[in-house]
C-alpha cells in the first residue's frame, strides 16, 4: 500500500517503501509551492525563466518538469542540398502531418505484398511459384514440384534456350537457367484505364505488387534532392547546455579532408551539425550557471529574439568554414539559472528579454517546519532511493533523524528557525551514505544507526577541517611538511661544500 504524502503525514508510513512517488515531475519538486504557479504558466504559455538561488535547491529539476508539460514536437528540420550553390544548403521544415503522409507514400512506393495464389496464373508461373504441369503452388526456390515431381521451370529454360539460339549464343551454365524471373511486367485495366503493373518476387514465399502510383512515387523519390535531417521529429523536449562551447551551443559544419570533392568527399549539407539551440526547438533549453558562458549570452539573446539562428562552419581552417545555413528554426523556452552573486554578470539585454517575455524567480532555501513539509522530506528520501537504485529504503525513524538534520541545517546555514532546509542535494548525499552503510551491513532497510553515522560523516571538507583543527589557519600550518617549515626560515649555507658543482 502506498501513502500519498500530499495528503498523509509521516506517522502513516513504516518505511519509505510505503511512499507514493508522483508521476508528474512538478509534484516531485520539494518546497517551492510559492513559485509553482509561475512555473506552470511558463510551460503553458511558453515563457522564459531565470531561476536564481544557491546550488542544490532544485533549479534543474524545475526546468525538466517544464519540459514534461510541453506537447510533443510537431516540426522536423531538414537541410537540403543546393545544387547551384552547395555551400548554401536550404532549410526545409515539415510538420507531423506532412511527415506521416510522406511515410504513407513511401510505403505505397514500396508496394503491396500478396500471396502467390492471389497473383495472375501466368505471373505466378513465371516467378516460379506455380507448377505449369499440375497447378500446385510451392516455394519459388523449389525447382521440382512437390506434388507431381515435374520441373517447374522447364518453360523458362525452353524460352531462354530459344532466345539464345536466335541470338547465336550457347549456354555457359545450365544451373543459372533454373532460377525463375525476379520481376514480371504486365498491364491491367482498372475502371476502364489500362496501367502498368510490376510483380516482384520477395524471397520464396511472397510477391510485391507495384502499381502505377507506386512506380510514380518511386521515380519522385529517386529524383528528390538529397537531404539531411538535423532535428528529427521524435526528440527530447529538454536540452541541457550547461558549460557548452560555441560549437555545441550554436552548431557547426564538419571538416571534409577532401574539400567537398563530389567523388571523394561529402557534400556540405551532409556535414551540417545542429547546436543545442536548434535541438531545443519547440522544447526547453536549460543552462545552469549561465555566467560561465558569458561570451555566448549575446547569441542566446539573438536566437530568443529572432527564433532562428544560422549554422556556419566555425573553424576558419576547416573546409566547412565557407558553408552557411540561414534561418534554422530555434523557437525554444529558455530557462537560465544562476546564484545571487552572479546576477551582475548576466548580459542586460538578455535579462530584459527574459523580463519582457517571461519571469525572474528567486527560489527559497528553506520551508516552514510543518507536518506536511516533514512528510515532503520523506517523499524526497523515497525519490532519492528510487533514483539511486542501489540502496535500500529507510525506516520512518531514520527519516525522522534526517528531518532533524534538515532543521539544524536551516538554522546553521540560512539562520532560519522553525524551518527545514531546501538544500536537498546535500541531504541526498546523506541518504546515499546511509544507504551504502546499510548495504555493507547487510541490512534490508536504512536504520537509525546508519543515518546517525551518515549525518556525522557526510559533511564538507571545510567542516571536517574545523572539527579536527578548530580553525582553517591551524589546518594550513599543520598541513606543511617538515621541509616546508624549514624553508620558511631559510638555510644556513656558509659551511656547504659546493666544489662538486
UniProtKB/Swiss-Prot annotation:
The keyword Cell cycle does not apply. Residues 481-501 are annotated as: Disordered. InterPro entries: AAA+_ATPase, CbbQ/NirQ/NorQ/GpvN, Mg_chelatse_chII-like_cat_dom, P-loop_NTPase. One of its GO terms (biological process) is proteolysis. Residues 481-494 have a biased composition (Polar residues). Keywords: ATP-binding, Hydrolase, Nucleotide-binding, Protease, Serine protease. The keyword Hydrolase applies. It is an enzyme of class 3 (hydrolase). Gene3D superfamilies: 1.10.8.60, P-loop containing nucleotide triphosphate hydrolases (3.40.50.300). Its EC number is 3.4.21.-. ATP binds at residues 53-60. GO terms for molecular function: ATP binding; ATP hydrolysis activity; serine-type peptidase activity. Belongs to the peptidase S16 family. This is Putative lon protease homolog.
